[in-house]
């Protein structure tokens, strides 16, 4: 029996100035299936889906819904064709309840009783297996609960075609499994589910078919059961690449950074770090896992001298002098003047890491460089070093003088990582260093971090992919609500165990006990 087509794209093209986001894309989505849209950053996945959802309008091509051509120029038009999109960044009003957010923007001329809306929201939740309190305010919800509200919003409006953009990016493994269970129930109900993602293992777990995009073009659509991770990766990148992460045992580790009982509050007096203690050793990679906004950014910035702490100590064991230096509330300049060789790849690339209007060479000149072990040449002029970074990390740029703000996010990240590694650090902190990078470049960065570890550098790596954390890191520190909930051995840690700690609240005594056990 032939499958019934829910939506079909024919020769869809979309450009932004001289940039071709999508070119002659053909795609078919069937009723009652889960289709994964797979591609690297910049491959055109989100742009293509935004045209189905009415955010953009195609320059060329046709969208066919239910056998008829559809003109979709706004999200309101999309809902008329029973299409709804759940974006990666939620569009909710924090002070409203779940139900109030659900009916916000429903302009059909009807009057709504909130009690009736609450009942219908509860009925939708029960039908598909959601757990949600319709009367709960958004600011009181977890990330997964907020995502549930977004999904119910489109179901309430009658959506039969649902598009989810990176739906698991901020979820724990347990929350991801719950979401997948809900999506499978929707599929059984005849809904068409389109998932935009770059996580290969999730694609193989949840989808029926996979459509691969590369550089704005549709490469192929394959049955998930008939493909493999290696085949999909080759289609995404255009060549065969190795997806192996090398994790050698730490050699002669010694205490390099000792963080003791540090706490901090933000500008509004809200505690963002609560009695944090851990030790980073030379020759190891210490991973930091946590739901977004759990204190990862503040922790690294406090060590780098960019965020004040209210209590505690940050001690650096200087390998040159053998003396312990206290870095508490010192500025980056003061830290450097102490002879501390600390490199930092911040989460905010252009706001904190690089100067957007300056070229790569000038951004490199912002730092002083000393001879050290790295993949880059030592003691060479900044311009030559810029060329070496461009070559080694395959930075796509017209030349080394091009302002970095004109580069893509992934290329900006490569410049920043290259500059920080070239400074020959003894401590290297990297917050989401592969965010925005393609698969090939991501594994290049993982290998660079491993090389730094083998050179005796204490590497602190903040990541969001638990598979990478468990493959790359020697130990994994888990943080939630500004408090350490556990420190695990990276070689034995399970993703599910990390996920539980990411949502668990523990006492300071429990966290210290976990740290002690991890270091034994």
Identify the function of each model-found stretch.
Residues 2-520:
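Glycine-rich phosphate-binding loops of nucleotide-dependent enzymes
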